[in-house]
Regions:
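Bacterial N-terminal signal peptides that target proteins for export
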Residues: 1-8
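Short pre-active-site segment immediately N-terminal to the catalytic Zn-binding motif
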Residues: 194, 291-314
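Hydrophobic h-region of N-terminal signal peptides that target proteins for export
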Residues: 12-20
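Beta-strand-enriched, solvent-exposed domains that form extended recognition/catalytic surfaces
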Residues: 27-152
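Active-site-proximal segments of metallohydrolase catalytic domains
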Residues: 218-294
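Fold-level signature of zinc-dependent metallopeptidase catalytic domains
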Residues: 154-210, 223-233
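Catalytic Zn2+-binding segment of zinc metalloproteases
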Residues: 315-331
Length: 438
């Protein structure tokens, strides 16, 4: 009896995989279509412009769940068949442009930001729609355009002149696992031995940390040896400017520790023809800092005493779509409006708590002290015990001390000292991995 059940389970799994492959092969080729856009505007306006289309050999993104989304993000890409209107591919993301819109600078000037998205190369003409949403999850900008795979102006890239690369960790075939590229920023040709050691450090930071440790056969980590003309990273508040391959700098949006690059086209140029789906950028500096943007990239200093936890934290943003759980009393006051449920799986405003970690709350017998009750939901009183594992509803998160709630007292998404992701973040990452690979 057990043998029959096992054989039936194997048969069902095989049929599911075959159906996924069939669906992919029906609509797409084993190539990548790269779409370059410019997002521009002010704090109140948004405009989307198509810049360029290009194609490269191989598709290294997901081949499962092509027409569904696990996380909403602040923006979405949707691909439809023109005749039937059938959705054949969806992708969600966040952008630095939308984050910039909440800054004081955005009230004074209009700016433009590069954005690059990848999708499998279609076998027939498709309609591609890019949609941006505001903090209330209302559509704030949208652009739909036709892509004809026979268009002679779709530039061919990635066939020659690839940036040198090699695997740091290979969990499996690129068609079955998640490819993560690790790029060098601020490393000269002479620094590449150091970069290789830094890549191994980054890989170990992930694979020694749950849930990545248990899921290491689901990931490939690839070192990409992208040389800069000068060593180091630009730090504007110290009047230090360095000629680096991706032009990154600290002081993003005038925040000293916020390390990013705005040159996304350059980032993807360096990766042309290389297996990649997610991007890590290691910065050759001891200066503390980093940044992570959901389904865009994450960046971290490589030589700071806190580099290891920062790398894991920022990957939580860029890969897992996790929100920051720390908070202030006077910043980002409108980042998470009280009438809108955040899309990040580890934050809630209680508008739709059922969709978050309500099912993970302890039974009545094991509940902690209740601070207050809002919308029928008990808000947990912090007690300093079981800091990283006791799931509750703790007020303070998403940069706001009031009105936004987090799952535990301390988590990797709140402080560097936390040794683990909390149970809610752990589950969210595992779900993402399953979404990409099954």
């Amino acid at each position: 009896m057990h043998i029959k059940r096992t054989l039936l389970a194997i048969a069902c799994a095989t049929l599911t995989l075959a159906a996924s492959a069939q669906d992919f092969n029906k609509h797409f080729e084993d190539r990548t279509l790269r779409l370059d856009y410019n997002f521009s505007g002010t704090n109140r306006t948004q405009q989307i412009s198509l810049d360029e289309l290009s194609q490269s050999p191989g598709w290294y993104g997901r081949r499962h769940n092509l027409d569904s989304l696990l996380i909403r993000g602040n923006g979405q890409l949707e691909v439809k068949l023109p005749d039937s209107g059938k959705t054949i591919y969806r992708y969600s993301f966040s952008t630095l442009f939308q984050e910039w819109q909440s800054s004081e600078e955005a009230t004074k000037v209009q700016k433009s930001f590069e954005n690059v998205f990848l999708m499998p190369f279609p076998k027939q003409p498709v309609d591609v729609t890019i949609t941006l949403s505001d903090t209330h999850n209302h559509v704030s900008a949208s652009l739909t355009h036709r892509v004809d795979p026979k268009d002679i102006l779709i530039r061919q890239i990635g066939t020659t002149g690839q940036t040198p690369w090699k695997y740091v960790h290979q969990g499996g075939d690129s068609k079955e696992v998640i490819d993560v590229a690790i790029l060098a920023e601020g490393y000269t040709e002479k620094d590449m031995d150091t970069f290789w050691e830094d890549c191994k450090m980054a890989k170990e930071s992930f694979l020694n940390h749950e849930p990545f440790k248990s899921l290491q056969d689901k990931f490939n980590f690839i070192a990409v040896f992208s040389p800069s003309k000068e060593s180091g990273i630009s730090i504007p508040h110290k009047n230090l400017w360095v000629n680096t391959v991706m032009g990154s700098n600290y002081d993003t949006f005038y925040s000293e520790r916020y390390l990013t690059t705005l040159k996304l086209k350059r980032v993807h140029d360096l990766l042309s023809g290389i297996p990649y789906e997610h991007i890590i950028i290691l910065a050759n500096t001891e200066n503390y800092g980093g940044g992570g943007i959901y389904n865009s990239y994450m960046m971290s200093s490589a030589h700071n005493v806190k580099t290891r936890p920062v790398i894991v934290h920022e990957f939580g943003h860029s890969f897992g779509g996790l929100g920051d759980e720390y908070f202030y009393d006077d910043q980002y006051e409108t980042m998470y409006p009280a009438d809108t449920e955040p899309w990040e799986p580890n934050l809630t405003t209680l508008v739709d708590f059922d969709s978050k970690w309500k099912d993970m709350l302890p039974t009545n017998a094991k509940k902690s002290k209740i601070a207050k009750t809002i919308k029928g939901i008990d808000i947990t009183e912090p007690d300093g015990k079981d800091l990283y594992t006791k799931v509750g509803v703790y007020e303070g998160g998403g940069y706001q001390s009031k009105g936004v709630y987090r799952p535990v007292q301390e988590c990797r998404m709140k402080i560097n000292e936390a040794p683990v992701f909390c149970p809610v973040c752990d589950r969210a990452i595992r779900r993402i991995v399953k979404y990409y690979t099954e």
